C-alpha cells in the first residue's frame, strides 16, 4: 500500500526542551503519563502551556536493531521558556538536535503511525535521493488530541538526513 504523505526538506536549529524519558516498546509506552508529568511540571512552575511550545516525541533507538524493552524515547515540550527552568523529578531539560530533515506529514489517528513508519521506511525513503542519518528522529504533534478527532490529528515525522 502506497500512502500519500506530504513531504518536504527542512533545516532546524537545536532547541531546548522539557522531557520525560520512557524505556520499552514504542507501541505500548505510557505516552499519556509522560505528557501529564510535563504538563503538571509546567503548571507547577507557572508556565501555563509554555507559550510558543512544540510538542515532540524523540525516538532514540531503532526498533529494528534494538530489543523492544531497551528502546528509549523522550516525550518533550520545546519552548523558549525552558531556558529559565530547572529539572525536577522525572522532568529533565534536554536539547533536541537540529540539522537537515526530511519531514512527512500524516493526517490520522496515532494508532496508525506504525503503518505510516512502515510505508515511509519501506517505500517513500527509498524513492527519495536522501541519505538517512543514524540519529534520533522525532514526531511533532500539530494539534491537540484532547480537542481533535483522531482522523484529523496532524503529525509530522522528522527524519534526519545528510
Q: What are the roles of these predicted feature ranges?
A:
Residues 1-162:
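A solvent-exposed interaction/effector surface
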